[in-house]
Amino acid sequence: MEEQVANAIEIASNPSSEPALKAQAFDFVNQLRSDPSGWQVCLSLFTQTPQRSGIVRHVALEVVNGAAQGGLIDLQALAFVKDGLLAYLRQVYGQDAGASDPPNIQNKIAQTVTFLFSALYANGWETFFDDLLSLTYKSPSSTARDNASGIIFYLRVINSIHDEIGDVLVSRSRNEQDKANSLKDLIRQRDMQQITSSWQQILSEWRDGNDVIVEMCLKAVGSWVSWIDIGLVVNQTMLDLLFQQLGRAQKADLRQGEEKVRDAAVDVFTEIIGKKMKAEDKIDMIIFLNLDTIVSQLSNSPPLHANRFTFKYDTDLAETVAKLVNITVIDIVRALEQEGVSAECKEKANGLLQVFLPHILRFFSDEYDEVCSTVIPCVSDLLTYLRKIAKINPALAAQHSSILLPILKAIIAKMRYDDTSSWGDEDDQTDEAEFQELRKRLGVLQQIVASVNEQLYMEAVSEVVGTTFENLRQSGAQLDWRDLDLALHEMFLFGDLAVKAGSLYTKGSPNNQAAERLIEMMLRMVESDIRSFTHPATQLQYMEICVRYSSFFHHHTHLIPGVLESFLQLVHHPVKKVKTRSWYLFQRLVKQLRQYIGNVAQTVVEALGDLLVIQAEVSPEGSDGDEMSSEDHEGSADAVFNSQLYLFEAVGIICSTPTVPADKQVLYAQSVLNPIFLDMEKNLEAAKSHDERALLQIHHDIMALGTLARGFSDWMPGTNTPATLPAPEVSEAFNQVSEATLVALESLKTSFNVRTAARFAFSRLIGVLGSRILPQLPRWIDGLLTQTSSRDEMALFLRLLDQVIFGFKGEIYSILDTLLTPFLQRVFSGIADPTTGTDDEIRLAELKREYLNFLLAVLNNDLGAVIISERNQPIFETVISTIEHFSKDIDDFTTAKMAFSVLSKMGSSWGGPDIAPDATNGVPPQAALPGFSQFMISRFSPLCWALPTTPSFNSKDAQARQVLAEAGGLQRTIYSKTGMEYIAYLRDRELPGMGMGGELIEEFLGALSRLDLKGFRQFFPSFIQRLSA
């Protein structure tokens, strides 16, 4: 059997094995894993002499591990496994050991031994640590732990045990954690003394002899210290041994592997300080360990001092020491801010804070960002503490300036690009992203400093910015771009303090002192020769700042022409990232400065002409946008076109400023429109033949037309914006845009992309054309709502129509009357189509709600007559039946509630004048639709009971109660229109037919006739809840 298992493992692991035979071998080994007796063969295979091959032994032990952890081995059998493995360990690692196992086998054995420890240490293997420690001697007579292979295995198991029961980062169930805690208690009772004694002996005897042993031992001390008596580690014997290992940091040249020992020794101190204890005890511990001296010595050691700013600088050690500084300062600050800590302790902590401030600054200002990042948590805690103190007592803010100022200067210095860094190189994208993330974290720290001492922050930033612009004035392009970028970045962040409600000004005056400072900076920036500074990073920053602080130009309009000139140069930037971003920023700038720009349209249109050429690029087949990096996406054809659209909007904004005469607006608009019209005409035939590039070109052309229209007018029907419709001649010019889009849509309405672009253009053209667009509405609907239109498309278009109805309610009746039936038939078709999957169900629910919103828009804007006109009479029953269906949908309460709202509005609109008081809140009576009062009673009233009588209806559900309230509102509306006729119907037919008793009927009818609309809406849900109880 053993040979069979060994052969199967060899075949399964051999790449050159015949596939069918290999598959059989895999199956055999997998069956072995689940066989209750398979582990016995594998244990024998592993411990055999002479040894089997490495792969056989590895897999065999894996099977034993799997069986033990899977519960296939009972306690008695585990004892057998323990005896077998212990004999093996003594033979291979003990006093007569030859060559030990390779690391992968050692790790696998350590894993097995750790499991056996968990299962048997409490009961069955009480001598666990004695047995392992016996491996550390070469002979029973040895007085020193002199067996290297045995010590390494012992430490391997020690570290594995910590991972199993002591590592707080490992997720455990409640039972697992309880077991881990009881095992730790047992170790502390039985063996902790001898374990820590063994560490001291190993560190003493092997301190210079074997770096692997020393490193493993230090890791064991560092990991176990978190859950053992601190006195077992923090004692003079152990500390002397740790200090000896720290001494390696003073060596100029370390042998290979020695730096790991040194770093592990520092980590032990970090773990000691990280141990949970009272604030007073922690402060005393920091003082007792003399950590200030330790950190000072390490900071001044050759790897961190003499080698700093050279290629020999030891970043690993710097990061390791930074962790020690970070955890120490966090505990110092915790002692300072905790309530209940004695005054004496706080005084000690304050002293330590002053002592550690140079250490914080040393590592916070380290040129390597990973080192700086390591101490950011403690800097954040310290600044947050200072902010808390300053809030309680503002006078203390000035006292803390000796701490704040050097930290702030370090923050600002770290925000500067490194001298070795470049900008925009594709190879440096990861570094750039990491640096920007660091800048964000530093920005948060800077905000805290500003909140502690605003004046200090303003002075520091003003000095950096002022000095940089002065250097720029004197040396021009010789200035390092990194310095200018830093000054501009600080200006951008400064707005967090200076800008209120999007502006630097309130009633024409600067918001505050920070705004005054920023206005001075803006003047210096715009008036300096920054435009001649050609580095892309600073050019981008310049544009971002101009846009962010555009309110500055409202009060310095004489500077606008120069800034516009700069932007017009930068929109042609050779670096794609800068160029495409500048298109967006240009649009933002001109939109915010629209009323101040003046008549520069001709200049702008001519300057941008070459950038307004549209060239669609079809994505290569198989390219997957999801797998594209953000940088790649920014440069993709789609992303570039989306950015290009901002230029079209910017042109529209500039050409329609108040200073440009209407005839000139038309002229400039046509200079942009005509090339697009020609392009659409050129590509239409190819697009009709489903040419992918031609279809995409027409999509892009229509999107550009719609975007240009948006630039010309912000006006939207029914909104309260101050914008107005453009001059009639401008609207007439854009009528051509509508016609050109419709021609393309009518020819290409099967294309989703073309429909999407056309819907976009339609929504933008409304603002330029106003009511001129209404006669074309049937054509728009015919093109946008086709047999292939998705529910999403229908819902989006319904939303647009709501706006059109609201804006043009006085002019739309006849058109709406003509198109309502065919339009609703398409919507009904979309609602009736079967759904496939959750996403489809969500889209269906959205379409239902937009359909109901559309009906409400029609009714609320006094256009309800169109639904019951002679032309639309045939579809009226379908309209009502869909609403009835929605009102009974127990799976969609939102739609059901809306359905009742529509029915109530119909009752108010067509039910005639009120004959019962207080129902429609003063709405003037309308002429009754003949027979509608009876229709409401027979069709609408029963719906109010349909949902609550559904078996699965829960009357306590919050959404269900909202639906019932709306249903109660409908009942009150019916009563207000029909009075006693409705009361009689309810008393004689509807309520008895539901099995309701006389007392309940009278209670219900009394409430209906007595309560107003609001009162009955509250009554009905409670009434239903009582009936359901």
Curated annotation (Swiss-Prot):
The keyword Nucleus applies. One of its GO terms (cellular component) is cytoplasm. GO terms for molecular function: small GTPase binding; tRNA binding. Keywords: Cytoplasm, Nucleus, RNA-binding, Transport, tRNA processing, tRNA-binding. The keyword tRNA-binding applies. It is found in: Nucleus; Cytoplasm. InterPro entries: ARM-like (IPR011989), ARM-type_fold (IPR016024), Exportin-1/Importin-b-like (IPR013598), Exportin-T_C (IPR045546), XPOT (IPR040017). GO terms for biological process: tRNA processing; tRNA re-export from nucleus. tRNA nucleus export receptor which facilitates tRNA translocation across the nuclear pore complex. Involved in pre-tRNA splicing, probably by affecting the interaction of pre-tRNA with splicing endonuclease. Belongs to the exportin family. PANTHER family: EXPORTIN-T, EXPORTIN-T/LOS1. This is Exportin-T. It comes from Aspergillus clavatus (strain ATCC 1007 / CBS 513.65 / DSM 816 / NCTC 3887 / NRRL 1 / QM 1276 / 107).
